[in-house]
Structures are given as C-alpha cells and as structure tokens.
Amino acid sequence: MPQIKSAIKRVKTQEAARVRNIAQMNAMRTAVKKFKTATEQNADNSQDLYKAAARAIDMANSKGLIKKNKAGRDKSRLSALLNK
C-alpha cells in the first residue's frame, strides 16, 4: 500500500480508470456479439446493430483501449458479415 499522498491518489485514479475501461470494453464486446447473432439469424435490424458495433469499436479505439489496426480489422470483418 502506498504511503505517499500522491501515490494514494494515483491508486484511486487508476482504479476508477480501470473500472471505466472494463465497462467500455464490455459494451463494445456486447455490441459486436449482438450484431453477429443478428446476422446469423438474418434479422431486419442488422444494419442498425452494425452501426452501434462500429461506433463502440471507434469509441474503444479513441479511448486507447484497442489499437487502430485492430479497430479497422474488426470493423472490416463486421462489414463483410453485413454484406454477406
């Protein structure tokens, strides 16, 4: 456990950021899973779910949770599923 005041503050800040990052990643994964299940079942709202998933991927990328290449690769794969 840190003894220095600034280190104690850093631990609190890091914990808050960790919780926020986990929530953002979970939201992204959920959006992608919803889109994939919708495309497998040939649902009508797959276009809307694609937009939501792409937006979630972009948000995770902009927050530094995933790298730029992974974001592009994931979006490309989702669009290929959509156009199939």
Curated annotation (Swiss-Prot):
SUPFAM superfamilies: Ribosomal protein S20 (SSF46992). The keyword Ribonucleoprotein applies. It comes from the Bacteria. Keywords: Ribonucleoprotein, Ribosomal protein, RNA-binding, rRNA-binding. Pfam families: Ribosomal_S20p. Belongs to the bacterial ribosomal protein bS20 family. Binds directly to 16S ribosomal RNA. This is Small ribosomal subunit protein bS20. It comes from Lacticaseibacillus paracasei (strain ATCC 334 / BCRC 17002 / CCUG 31169 / CIP 107868 / KCTC 3260 / NRRL B-441) (Lactobacillus paracasei).
